[in-house]
């Protein structure tokens, strides 16, 4: 018999129903469950797939560069970054009528185009790219890297080049390589690029390979480095009147600590960023030489962890046993990596708008909104994934004997206390926050707004003041001109920093009031509830009082039949599934808050946010309804405009989202009946019944239907908000 899909599971391949296809797709990447898998092949497959992933990333980024060079307007944007709309790529659509062609022909283009809201123009401009030729060169280089990655992936699957399991489990070598080789060297290389190419470009000097060795980044070259006069590199920075990209007002410094923003570009000083990357490079290059490999010196990770036994014995055996537990579990390692990456991605979202690194990006409001929202959603999915793999670790890889009385075992031993505390925090936050919102809502509805309960966030205001914000009147730390902290930084970074914090045109330490206090606690409710569901799912993954043998059923099971009532919805997968809804809900509140606060700031009517954000109807009417009105006006006598595509996407997003409920609310029996009726009709319809299928059609399993429903819910939710966000922002600010 010919091999049928899936080849990795002979049991599934012989299944006579459509379950073969869906289960095959569902388990395609679960290498551990495949036939004939060995630990060695598992590690090698994952290693090779990493190169495939890199190839895809390089190909994708190469495509960005190529399409902007081919169809964009980078060179004219460079001449006037604040007024020319950056073009992502052309739109080719044979169905377009003349009104559509006119509506989407903008940014100086000859035909319909998409505007770029990704910030790539600002990024490329900041790092020294200036011409389409530069972009083509970059695209070709990335294409080359993509090909190299594919070759490397293929190579490491060949018998002679397959790494051994011991190589994959050599923790110290991997740490040294990643810390020094990847983070350290790449940060140093980036410092070099900023100093040799980007900073000269910001001062009107065009450095490329042909003059790279002739143009000194600093008048004194390497002299100050070798004579120990490093402070010379910080002297004579760009002046506050510097015009970015020209020599006018430019200085000669390359590594500075100015603080604050470049007055014209509203972004961090390039020389500050070069200095930052040099410091990061130094730290990581040192860190990457700390672990014991070939020379018998340095730390051993196992010794480090085994030595971590807290004195007093109150935390048992501390970190004993953790080295082997982590080093032998890919799910544990993936969980740690995803947790770290998720937090970093969220930090990127927060810092990209408050401390913009790219020239002129702060004045491109739609791009700011899109990048914040994009990174927060990505962070949410990555963080929930961390807990999913944590749960799979507990089910598949955790060994109680190996971890007796260490911190991991103790987490499991007192999971009831952890879960109940999280539950208490969620309930407290939920009832109090909703209570305040509802009270205020009723007061507004009855025409007595003065009876609202409005709480000033005094602790947060105090923290902002400690960092130098003076408008609240707290005389503390950096907002106190007499304090030692103020005087210590006065001669270096502090003037630039204080200027940035107290200038109301940027997003650094926005002024906060009762509306912020309330939405902060609503977001805290969402974060704690999402965490509660995820933590409970992982800690109860092996078993609970209700179902002590849960680990024997695996990661995702629907129920243990009718014999044990109450075992439905308690698999670790079900916890992940529920948590994703809460994650999306929370990030919805986060992005609503960020976007509304910023559009009122950009429009100069902050009082709208301050007055309307303290009650629910304010959010519904003055944020959601008011800003979606352009997207829901249907056909009008003015015909098509450039927001029409977002109006369509807004509608389509709602459709996809609503489709999710079809899978979430009706289960197998309903679908099985429907499928059998459809199959009956098909077999009795002339012509149609000439088409037969080999697999008997059966309904999706409960778990699969939930996954399909969750996927539609998530995609529709994000599509809808993306269209709303981009249209409402670009409709106001271009």
Swiss-Prot record:
Class in the EC hierarchy, top level: oxidoreductase
Record-annotated membrane-spanning stretches: 46-69, 135-158, 175-199, 273-291, 330-353, 369-395, 417-439, 517-535, 575-596, 643-665, 707-727
Membrane topology: Multi-pass membrane protein
Compartments where found: Plastid, Chloroplast thylakoid membrane
Binding site for chlorophyll a B3: 662, 670
UniProt: phylloquinone binding residues: 671
InterPro entries with a match to the protein in the record: PSI_PsaA/B, PSI_PsaA/B_CS, PSI_PsaA/B_sf, PSI_PsaB
Positions bound to [4Fe-4S] cluster: 559, 568
Major site of localization recorded for this protein: plastid
Record PANTHER family: OUTER MEMBRANE PROTEIN, OMPA-RELATED (PTHR30128), PHOTOSYSTEM I P700 CHLOROPHYLL A APOPROTEIN A1-RELATED (PTHR30128:SF19)
Protein name, UniProt field: Photosystem I P700 chlorophyll a apoprotein A2
Native organism: Solanum tuberosum
Gene: psaB
């Amino acid at each position: 018999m010919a091999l049928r899909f899936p080849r990795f599971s002979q049991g599934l391949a012989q299944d006579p129903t459509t379950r073969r296809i869906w289960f095959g797709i569902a388990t395609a990447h679960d290498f551990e469950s495949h036939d004939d898998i060995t630990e060695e092949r598992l590690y090698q497959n994952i290693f090779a797939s990493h190169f495939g992933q890199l190839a895809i990333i390089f190909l994708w980024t190469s495509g960005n560069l190529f399409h902007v060079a081919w169809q964009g307007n980078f060179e004219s944007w460079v001449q006037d970054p604040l007024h020319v709309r950056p073009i992502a790529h052309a739109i080719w659509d044979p169905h377009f009528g003349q009104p559509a062609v006119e509506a989407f022909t903008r940014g100086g283009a000859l035909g319909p185009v998409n505007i770029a809201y990704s910030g790539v123009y600002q990024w490329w401009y900041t790092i020294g790219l200036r011409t389409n030729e530069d972009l083509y060169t970059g695209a070709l280089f990335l294409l080359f890297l993509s090909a190299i990655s594919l070759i490397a992936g293929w190579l490491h699957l060949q018998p002679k080049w397959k790494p051994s399991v011991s190589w994959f489990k050599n923790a110290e070598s991997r740490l040294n390589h990643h810390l020094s080789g990847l983070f350290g060297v790449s940060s140093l290389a980036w410092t070099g690029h900023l100093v040799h190419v980007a900073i000269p470009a910001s001062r009107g000097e065009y450095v490329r390979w042909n003059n790279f060795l002739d143009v000194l980044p600093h008048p004194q070259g390497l002299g100050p480095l070798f004579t120990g006069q490093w402070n010379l590199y910080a002297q004579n920075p760009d002046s506050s009147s510097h015009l970015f990209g020209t020599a006018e007002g430019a200085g000669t410094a390359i590594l500075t600590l100015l603080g604050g923003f470049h007055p014209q570009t509203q972004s961090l000083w390039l020389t500050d960023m070069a200095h930052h990357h040099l410091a990061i490079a130094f730290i990581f290059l040192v860190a990457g030489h700390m672990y014991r490999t070939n020379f018998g010196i340095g730390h051993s990770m196992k010794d480090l962890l085994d030595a971590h036994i807290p004195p007093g014995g109150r935390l048992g055996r501390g970190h004993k046993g953790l080295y082997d537990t982590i080093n032998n579990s890919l799910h544990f390692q993936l969980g740690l990596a995803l947790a770290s990456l998720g937090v970093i991605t969220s930090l990127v979202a927060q810092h990209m708008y408050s401390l913009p690194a790219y020239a002129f990006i702060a004045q491109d409001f739609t791009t700011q909104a899109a990048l914040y929202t994009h990174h927060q959603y990505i962070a949410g999915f990555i963080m929930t994934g961390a807990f999913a793999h944590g749960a799979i670790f507990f089910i598949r890889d955790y060994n109680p004997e190996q971890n007796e009385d260490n911190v991991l075992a103790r987490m499991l031993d007192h999971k009831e206390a952890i879960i109940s505390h999280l539950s208490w925090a969620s309930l407290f936050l939920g009832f109090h926050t909703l209570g305040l919102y509802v009270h205020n809502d009723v007061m507004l509805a009855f025409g007595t707004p003065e009876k609202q309960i409005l709480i000033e966030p005094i602790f947060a205001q105090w923290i902002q003041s400690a960092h130098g914000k003076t408008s609240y009147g707290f005389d503390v730390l950096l907002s106190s001109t007499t304090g030692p902290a103020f005087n210590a930084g006065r001669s270096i970074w502090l003037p630039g920093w204080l200027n940035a914090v107290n200038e109301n045109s940027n997003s650094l330490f926005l002024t906060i009031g009762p509306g912020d206090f309330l939405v902060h606690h609503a977001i805290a409710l969402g974060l704690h509830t999402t965490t509660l569901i995820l933590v409970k799912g992982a800690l109860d993954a092996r078993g609970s009082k209700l179902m002590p043998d849960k680990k024997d059923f695996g990661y995702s099971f629907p129920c243990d039949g009718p014999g044990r009532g109450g075992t439905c919805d308690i698999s670790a997968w079900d916890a992940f599934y529920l948590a994703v809804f809460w994650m999306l809900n929370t990030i919805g509140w986060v992005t609503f808050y960020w976007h509304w606060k910023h559009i009122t700031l950009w429009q100069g009517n902050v009082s709208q946010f301050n007055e309307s954000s303290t009650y629910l109807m304010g959010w519904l009417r003055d944020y959601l309804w008011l800003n979606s009105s352009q997207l829901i006006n249907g056909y009008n006598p003015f015909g098509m405009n450039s927001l029409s595509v977002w109006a369509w996407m807004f509608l389509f997003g709602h459709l996809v989202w609503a489709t999710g409920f079809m899978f979430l609310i009706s289960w197998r029996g309903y679908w099985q009946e429907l499928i059998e009726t459809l199959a009956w009709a098909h077999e009795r319809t002339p012509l149609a019944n000439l088409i037969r299928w080999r697999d008997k059609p059966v309904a999706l399993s409960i778990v699969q239907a939930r996954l399909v429903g969750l996927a539609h819910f998530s995609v529709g939710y994000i599509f809808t908000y993306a269209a709303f966000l981009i249209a409402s922002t670009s409709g106001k600010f271009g």
